[in-house]
């Protein structure tokens, strides 16, 4: 369903051009109790409601999930990420993404999108409400086979029901790839992992249809841009730390995810979230 368009791009740009900056005075306390100072001078405009709050982003693809993951992939593919590697990484020669741009993808847990962004003007407060966690950007290098397993495990709660809502928190919004989940096939539960998940005993529910417009290669290496929480194995993400251990270039950067999303909105979208995000873009098919 396409969301109601509330303002034209031209009008939005005019409004943004006339906005007056004011001194920063707001703070936000995140889910870990950290008090974050917000810059009230930062403003952008969404032409459509950006939907991602908990249940919506656990059930399937959303336009906010597309935006969020696009920001992460852009951050890596553009080279912006190069300035945010830890000193130890730089010393070891890990100063840029080690694969071509067409092998960069981004994954983000639907349960880690906690609010919608209503159409209209918004600022840092709204992004903090979407992600009330101090997440950092991480890079995990995975083979195609590991990437399929990551998506298989992340989708184990589908189809979404009241009983599977907790397990569906791990469902992945994505950028740079298209995938299909066949819910007619039962998830093959292996070893229990955490409170709500199981490792995949076998694969078969998830198919990666393409990666950045190219055929998927199970043997290729992909750079998966995600959160430090996934990198460490949050929710169903047991494949992430395992893959990271196998590839020493996998790392957690100093970049804050919310800052990266804002950077994308500002530098790439010109502070206006327009028609490209009117609705989910068809990256995920759930059968």
Model-inferred region functions:
Residues 17-29:
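Sec-dependent signal peptide cleavage junction
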Residues 10-18:
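Bacterial N-terminal signal peptides
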